[in-house]
């Protein structure tokens, strides 16, 4: 696609975690090789299936420490994960979350309380449900400016322009 320097597929899903009286929504994301590199402030970045790096703010607020086991549950008939519990091997940060706001969801209260990163093989999906795109020349434009927003919006329209064609291709493939 014209204007794309690099792209990488990823997986992500929202899950519930915690005790019944204090369930919170956690966004789980697959660890990327090239995009949005996470940092472990404590412990390590997951190296094996069943390991998780937790959001430092979420870990602090919920009392999680390296070595703890965190249990998660998916919504209804959603089966995107191979596991329902993970060992916390790291606590850290992600460039995707630079403010206190972790996003919105259709689960629980509608607010995501934190994020966690797991290995791609812990997702039980054949097809990516997210994509990260490095837009040509985006690094030369200051983030959050009108020029940056215009550049990204143009790329978003190009990607959306091929969506139906790609969905039909995938449908025929299956």
Regions found by a protein language model. Name each.
Residues 1-174:
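Membrane transport/envelope proteins' first extracytoplasmic loop
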